[in-house]
């Protein structure tokens, strides 16, 4: 496992060789050279950092709060002192704060994100909530975690893994840093499985969200990318297979709101 801090590129899966000779990756539905993607995707998250709740409200019709509560309830954080969790792509603290509160403020959560703007928002919120003593903020790469193996009791990632360029590497790193008996949980937008709901959600996603995003934040492009990135993410069964391939056991998932989002679980046994 790498011990160096790197830069993660929040884009989709590797695609093909580009004209410049570098590999191409998906940026939403667009193919971009790997040398361009870092700036493109980081710019998206710099833009939305201070309006992250608005973004999630638009993407989920407000349901992300319920899904996050369910994620932490399924995790069931321990109330014993010394229990540790790593929240990846968790810059603004939504999951970490819930974990600390659910543990009776016993848990210590490390919040890792590649984007400094997102981490800055998280620090401000943590101070206001009086949770800063239970948290550590780390700017680093999900594919090259700067931690020793067998360091954490739990690993969580919510609405972040679809933006990692090499999902298999991120999953492998998750497995490495978890202690034996540790839990992996991933909440992510997924494939809608209800015939009527999928059409309604597509209409909302591709037509309404970018327009509303532009009205509220003056930025339609960032919201278009975020919608497109959801469609590029593997289906529930395919992602579960990737988790198993990384070494996790007892892999399972739960659909939320007809599959608009899915919560995946795995154990390092």
Swiss-Prot record:
GO terms for biological process: aerobic respiration; menaquinone biosynthetic process; methylation. Transmembrane segments: none annotated. SUPFAM superfamilies: S-adenosyl-L-methionine-dependent methyltransferases (SSF53335). It is an enzyme of class 2 (transferase). Pfam families: Ubie_methyltran. Signal peptide: none annotated. It catalyses: a 2-demethylmenaquinol + S-adenosyl-L-methionine = a menaquinol + S-adenosyl-L-homocysteine + H(+); a 2-methoxy-6-(all-trans-polyprenyl)benzene-1,4-diol + S-adenosyl-L-methionine = a 5-methoxy-2-methyl-3-(all-trans-polyprenyl)benzene-1,4-diol + S-adenosyl-L-homocysteine + H(+). Pathway: Quinol/quinone metabolism; menaquinone biosynthesis; menaquinol from 1,4-dihydroxy-2-naphthoate: step 2/2; Cofactor biosynthesis; ubiquinone biosynthesis. S-adenosyl-L-methionine binds at residues 92, 113, 141-142. One of its GO terms (molecular function) is demethylmenaquinone methyltransferase activity. Keywords: Menaquinone biosynthesis, Methyltransferase, S-adenosyl-L-methionine, Transferase, Ubiquinone biosynthesis. Its EC number is 2.1.1.163, 2.1.1.201. InterPro entries: SAM-dependent_MTases_sf (IPR029063), UbiE/COQ5_MeTrFase (IPR004033), UbiE/COQ5_MeTrFase_CS (IPR023576). Belongs to the class I-like SAM-binding methyltransferase superfamily. MenG/UbiE family. PANTHER family: 2-METHOXY-6-POLYPRENYL-1,4-BENZOQUINOL METHYLASE, MITOCHONDRIAL, METHYLTRANSFERASE. Methyltransferase required for the conversion of demethylmenaquinol (DMKH2) to menaquinol (MKH2) and the conversion of 2-polyprenyl-6-methoxy-1,4-benzoquinol (DDMQH2) to 2-polyprenyl-3-methyl-6-methoxy-1,4-benzoquinol (DMQH2). This is Ubiquinone/menaquinone biosynthesis C-methyltransferase UbiE. It comes from Brucella suis (strain ATCC 23445 / NCTC 10510).
